[in-house]
Amino acid sequence: MESDMKSSYYLIFISLLLLAGCSSHGDASAQSQSNGMAVAKAAFDSAQYEKAERLYLALLSSDASLEEAQLMLARTRYQQDKKQAARDGLQQLLDRAGKQAPEAANYLGKFLLDDGRTEQAATAYRQGLALPELTPLARARLSNGLGVASLRQGAFAKGRALFEAAVAAAPDEPDYRGNLALGWLMEGNRIAARQAFEPLLHYQSLPPQVEMNYALLLLAEGNEPQARLILSRFLSASQLEHDIRLLKAQLRGLSV
């Protein structure tokens, strides 16, 4: 009996060792994976895109289920002008509807907009917005993206409504509020555009695109000197004159 008990204790002890060993191996593997992701991200952030691609591919060869690595691989490929491969990778992530699907929808929509594929971008954003359990910030990003696509398609009221949803979820995000002001302006409502933009005037600095949206609002209000001052920080003299003429022509069709 005593021998049987000793044998049982021995088996339990061995089992615990095996469990501890598996846990230790799992921890080491997770740490190695985390370190690999950090090194790859550092390469991406320093614009070493070929190196970053190799590192992400190596990570995925060890674990093909790493969605964050798949997302970053697509972003890395887009930066190397491997645009179709990047879009395909993002679409696959989006279709699987996993944890990285909202980010995949966001980048896929953005890349398609950058390439002038507005209808496809709108489809990507809509697919992202249909995902279950979106966080408020993810919903705001996707609503903003779909709003931009809507403006480009001439659906100003729809775009403005989407920007309102984005601002409601993230009221301190200057891009969303700047786009909301632009949406109101495209609908011809300068007063609402000014009200939407007003909170941003207290910010110490704004993204360039938001400042350019403000310059457009100033032009609509008849404040061309101030609009020129803002635009001159981003455009050459010849570009400035060309864009001022173009913007003024576009604004002639707008009314309060």
Please give the residue ranges for each predicted region.
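Bacterial Sec signal peptide processing site at the extreme N-terminus
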Residues: C22-V39
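Helix-start (N-cap) detector for alpha-helical repeat units in TPR-like alpha-solenoids
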Residues: S32-Q33, E67-E68, Q100-E103, P136-A140, ...
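Canonical tetratricopeptide repeat
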Residues: M72, N106-Y107, R141-G145, N179, ...
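Terminal, low-structured helical/coil segments at or just beyond the last alpha-helical repeat
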Residues: Y203-V256
